[in-house]
């Protein structure tokens, strides 16, 4: 079984322990992203997994690729070019203080990529399953187009498509998410989501607050 995932890899800068960003004078650095994390998880379970993204041709971009590849993920399909890797700052919550995330991902290599840069005939060669999350089409309109091109070819090639709705309110509104995700659902074979994501991404009220309904 060959799996291909498509999305953005980012540099995560986390405050030590439970320090707030305002308190920190150092940050713990690592790399990840929804689709990259799925690729790594599947690879560690022994699956044959490839990952598609775009990163700059400098040491930070290469470090991101190295981090994913060291877990056994095939990174040979990663595109190179552009100016920067997206960053997010992570402040872990404690007690009643919630976790906080600040995105700095504008103008990243993948956000500035054009749809035609992704040669899906080659990228999907030999693939059995294609995975993406709702984060990917929110990156840019060009990546939305690139994703839909991939999905259309998956349908033609009878490649199974798996989507995790994974709604991110800091990236787009529910109106924009529903406009895009409802259309993309036509290509999806397996959809993964919690009740909040179903409502935010698709406008489907999947939970009415009555816990007792779980027994029905």
Report residues per predicted region:
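Glycine-rich phosphate/adenosyl-contacting loop at the front of the ribokinase-like
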Residues: 1-74, 113-115
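Active-site metal-binding loops of divalent metal-dependent hydrolases
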Residues: 9, 135, 165
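Conserved N-terminal subdomain of the carbohydrate kinase-like
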Residues: 48-134
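Hydrophobic faces of well-ordered beta-strands that scaffold small-molecule active sites
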Residues: 51, 161-163, 191
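Charged helix-capping and loop-helix junction motifs
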Residues: 118, 144-149, 174-182
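Active-site-proximal loop/turn and secondary-structure-junction residues that shape catalytic pockets
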Residues: 136, 167-169, 197
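A short helix->loop->beta-strand "cap" motif at the edges of active sites that frequently abuts
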Residues: 153-160
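Conserved phosphate/ATP/ADP-binding segment of small-molecule kinases
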Residues: 171-216
């Amino acid at each position: 079984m060959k799996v291909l995932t498509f999305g953005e890899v980012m540099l995560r800068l986390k405050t030590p322990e439970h320090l707030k960003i305002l308190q920190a004078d150092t940050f713990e650095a690592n790399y990840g992203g929804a689709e990259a994390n799925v690729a790594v998880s599947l690879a560690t379970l022994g699956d044959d997994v490839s990952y598609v993204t775009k990163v700059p041709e400098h040491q930070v971009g290469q470090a991101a690729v190295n981090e994913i590849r060291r877990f056994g993920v095939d990174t040979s399909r990663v595109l190179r070019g552009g100016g920067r890797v997206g960053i997010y700052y992570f402040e872990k919550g404690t007690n009643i203080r919630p976790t906080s995330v600040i995105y700095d991902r504008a103008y990243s290599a993948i956000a500035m990529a054009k749809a035609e840069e992704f040669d899906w005939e080659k990228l999907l060669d030999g693939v059995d399953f294609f995975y993406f999350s709702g984060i990917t089409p929110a990156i840019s309109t060009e990546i939305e187009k690139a994703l839909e091109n991939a999905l259309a070819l998956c349908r033609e090639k009878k490649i199974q498509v798996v989507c995790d709705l994974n709604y991110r309110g800091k990236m787009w509104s529910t109106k924009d998410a529903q406009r895009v995700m409802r259309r993309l659902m036509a290509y999806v074979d397996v959809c993964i989501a919690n009740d909040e994501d179903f409502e935010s991404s698709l406008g489907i009220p999947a939970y009415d607050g009555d816990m007792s309904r779980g027994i029905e």
